[in-house]
Amino acid sequence: MFAWVSLSLWRDETNIPTGDIKETGLGGSVKRRLEIDAARGLMLVWMTLTHLPTLITPWVNQPFGYISASEGFIFLSALFTGRIYFRLLERDGAGAMTWKLFLRALKLYRYHVVLLFVAFLVVARFAISGHNQGLYNILDFYFAAGPARAIADALLLVYRPPLLDIIPLYLIFLLLSPLTLIAAAKIGWRYILGASFAIWLGAQFGLRQALYALAARHLGLHIPLNEMGAFNLWAWQFMWILGMWCGARWAKDDLPVEKWARKVWIPAALVAATLLAVRYTELRGLNLAGWSGLFDKWHLGVFRLINFAAIAALLVRFQSVVKPLAVRPLVLLGQASLQVFCAHFVFCFVGLGLMGGGDRIFGWPQLALVVCTFASLLVVAKVFARQELNAPQTRGSNARPTVKATARGYSQAS
């Protein structure tokens, strides 16, 4: 039933043109490439398949080398944030831009609160009554510290349960984005990028642990570091800043990414192939030993940045080959990425519940879970994609943007 409904919605979807789109409402001319929306949709599909505990999970976990859906999702989210809100800063000023970003962060925070209460009020009860170890493990601090403290810490974004820990990361980056854009406008991006790189470098040498120790000693922080999320915020902020920088340059039509890709695609291919070989050799037993930190996902090790840049260069260089992959379901998912991203966690909880005492789901239930998950996510995307496209982008604007198909790109004009 879910599959039939979602396929019907897909066929009936008329507000997503087959080419790129032209949207009015922001002023000036901006091109939006539908393949980038599709890329965000693909990151969500990839992330969902990685999180659902099925037999294909090991096969979709970093299959292209030392790169995961998280890098792509964070970078693309930052790319759109930089592009859209840099234009708002130029057109409407710092106040309007900050307010719009605050509202978007508030929307994400509301979704996060809903997911937290689903976890604490529904999942926690099922974990105890059903003796489900998978669900119990993701909420172990909730059970150890007690509901009152766990809920308070989670609402303050201090306690970040597994699975849900990327949302506080995203929220913090959104809240810091206005300051980043304003500072970049005043002092230039080179200083912002330099400072961000320095913080990332510090994160590779224990900055997170050092700051945690200081906070525990002087601020009374009494939550284990591992309960504050797997992602090292001090490292991952560099990926966000890089994405915002590219987005701001894109907004100014000053992002010669095709030219860059043409120059570097051969060494990029060699790097990507080498790291892919290392990745699969490691899976077969290669011990990286003291080098593992250079490949670490949670601390965004240097080889992950190199791998990401190499694959990005190849995708840009051969975009004509991958552009046909920008099919309407992926575009739709990408255009409602915020809501789809949050909704997929519900099905991850369901998957963990179906696991019981095993390490993953077997047999027909895994197929049913995957089909129902993506059918439901398409319904979510259908509901919210039009709202995301048509949301007024300017201060004081009550007019809904119009959408027109063009041969290439999209423009927003008042």
Across the structure, where does each feature detected by a protein language model lie?
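Alpha-helical transmembrane segments and their immediate juxtamembrane cytosolic regions
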Residues: 3-12, 17-414
